[in-house]
Amino acid sequence: LAAAVAAISFASPAQAVTDIMWWHAMSGELGRQLEKLAADFNASQSEYRIVPGYKGNYTETVTAAIFAFRSRSQPAIVQVNEIATGTMMAARGAIYPVFELMRDQAEAFSPAAYLPAVTGYYADVAGNMLSFPFNASTPILYYNKNMFRSAGLDPEISPKTWPEVGAAAKRLRASGAVCGFTTSWPSWINVENFSAFHNLPISTKANGFDGLDAVLTFNKPAVVRHIAQLVEWQATKMFDYSGRATSAEPRFQNGECAIFIGSSATRADIRANSKFEVGYGMLPYWPDVQGAPQNTIIGGATLWVLRDRPRDEYKGVAKFFSFLSKPEIQAAWHQNTGYLPVTRAAFDLTREQGFYDRNPGAAISIEQVTLKPPTENSKGVRLGSFVLIRGVIEEELEQAFSGKKSAQAALDSAVERGNRLLRQFERANPDR
């Protein structure tokens, strides 16, 4: 018996598996696809086990990770949405930059493999990647081809400019549509991506990339005119405000609104749940704005690595990121979820596999984010407390859409309130 116990004791260390916690914000089908990634990695080797844990929406997930870090019970990996990048960067002592992790663990990792829109958003000034790109999306236009036919519009041609959207919406309303068009994510689409696609700044300091002393500047004529036009169109339901986040999507799927501008990541869901033929197009632009169209910016999230976990876990995290970087893994994630292929190799593989030929509209998002090389106005937004600032912008947009404020007054107020939040963040992070 003693010999048997000794044999078991001797064998145990070789059989030990290191568990690695991964906190995330994906539920439903996306959550199942995420869990499949973890399961596939776990099955590919025997040393490490990725343990996914759903913690609610992005805000709830980040908040849970912050509180866990304070009690020293944090996960090794946490999924963080793009607008919290500036806040995460300020937490220097808590994060383990991905470029350092991969270098320390001798795992190959090249920012050049990723799309410029991705590296620009998540890299430091030296081009070093701070977090691991995971789920990326950008806004595109969806339209109901059946309703286009009823309105006498060509169902094979999507509106490319805002004047064309307005003209189409007018005809759609005249033909019986409840609303001509609507959008999800009001600030992300109508302020942040609107500005990027027209090569206009959100703020000074290269949208915050060059320092915490950035000042918001989006209350300028082009953005004001755009919001004012939406307000005017709303009077006749050519445009109809449908709320924040994804609340507009069902109005397109149920046939109320003929045109919908939303995340490219909803493409698969829209195609599966809409009882009509769906058309796709790029985000519209105003043709009289010099430099438009430029490129859109991404939304979604990346994976951040937190410090103060056992050393063995970091080796496993690095191997997991190498696994996720494989073209076939990236391509499958892109095809199964609707998120962008964040590497050029994954895009090329997906194209070679004929996916874009079989799925019209699936390539529009990557064509749009790579339309032109990113400028300092179109590589992203890196402002502290931007989660809160986006909320302020949407509050003020609602004031405009409800007729309580003019577009100019609403955007002026959003800039003033947002700048107060920026100064608070700057004071709270004096050493950054």
Spans of features found by a protein language model:
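Short, solvent-exposed loop/beta-turn-alpha elements that line the ligand-binding surface or hinge
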Residues: F99-Y114, S158, L200-R225, A272-N273, ...
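Extracytoplasmic/periplasmic solute-binding protein
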Residues: A123-F134, P139, P163-V215, C257
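A structural signal for short loop-to-beta-strand junctions that line the ligand-binding cleft
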Residues: F67, P75-A76, E107-M147, Q290-T296, ...
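Extracytoplasmic/periplasmic substrate-recognition and gating elements
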Residues: S44, G127, A151, A228, ...
